[in-house]
Amino acid sequence: MNILVADDEEMIREGIAAFLTEEGYHVIMAKDGQEVLEKFQDLPIHLMVLDLMMPRKSGFEVLKEINQKHDIPVIVLSALGDETTQSQVFDLYADDHVTKPFSLVLLVKRIKALIRRYYVIEDIWRYQDVTVDFTSYKAHYKNEEIDLKPKELLVLKCLIQHKNQVLSREQILEEISKDVADLPCDRVVDVYIRTLRKKLALDCIVTVKNVGYKISL
C-alpha cells in the first residue's frame, strides 16, 4: 500500500511518514505540488495526504489535475479551518479535511478508515455473469468454472483495487510482485489481460493507449 504524503513542512511530512511506516505502509514523500504530480508517474499511489498551501503548485491545483486521471482517497491538511476552504476542498472530491495542528494518532485512524472504504475487496467479486472467489482463486462464467492461472486473477484483483485508475504494465507487475516470484517482462500483462477478456468476457477492462489498463466499474 503506497501512501503519498505531501507537505512543504519537513517536520510534518516526516512525522506522518514515521507513523505510517510503523503501521506497515510504504510512504512516498513530496515537498511541493509539482513533485506530487511527478510521483504519480513513478508509482501507483493508493492514498494521498495533501497539504493545501505548498510551493510550485498548491493543493487545490494538484487536486484538479489528479482528479482527471486518478480515483484515489485524499485527505487534505490545512491551517485554514473555515467553512469556505472546507467547501472548496470537498468540491474537488477530497475525502476528508484535517485542520492543523492535528493528532497524528487520529490522522492515521482516518487514513485506515479510508483504506477500508476504498480497498477492502470482498472474497467474492461479481460482475454481470462473472463470479470470482479470490480466496480459492476460482472463477466462474455463466455458472461454469473457468480455468485461470493465479497470476491472471492477481492482475484482475489489482485492477479492481484501483478501479477507474489507469495503471501501466510496470505498475501492475509491481503490485502483484509481492505475491509472485520471478516475474517476466511487462508485456506478459497484455497476455493476462487478453485471457481475462476472452475467458470471462470482461468488457470493463479498458486499454488506455500508450499508458496501460484500467477497470471501469
UniProtKB/Swiss-Prot annotation:
Residues with PTM 4-aspartylphosphate: 51
DNA-binding region: 122-217
Intrachain S-S bonds: none
Keyword Cell division belongs to the record: no
Occurrences of domain Response regulatory (ranges): 2-115
Phenotype seen when the gene is deleted: Expression of CbpA down-regulated at transcript and protein levels. Significantly increases nasopharyngeal colonization in mouse CD-1 strain intranasal infection model at 48 h and 96 h post-infection. Significantly increases numbers of bacteria found in the mouse lung at 96 h post-infection.
Gene3D superfamilies for the chain: 3.40.50.2300, Winged helix-like DNA-binding domain superfamily/Winged helix DNA-binding domain
Modification(s) after translation: Phosphorylated at threonine residues by StkP; threonine phosphorylation enhances RR06 binding to DNA and may also increase expression of CbpA. May be de-phosphorylated by PhpP.
GO molecular function: phosphorelay response regulator activity; transcription cis-regulatory region binding
Gene Ontology, cellular component aspect: cytosol; protein-DNA complex
GO annotation, biological process: regulation of DNA-templated transcription
PROSITE patterns: OMPR_PHOB, RESPONSE_REGULATORY
Keywords noted in UniProt: Activator, DNA-binding, Phosphoprotein, Transcription, Transcription regulation, Two-component regulatory system
Miscellaneous: Probably part of an rr06-hk06 operon.
Summary of the function given for this chain in its UniProt record: Member of the two-component regulatory system HK06/RR06 involved in regulation of target genes, including choline-binding protein CbpA. Binds to the promoter region of CbpA and directly activates transcription.
Name by which UniProt lists this protein: Response regulator RR06
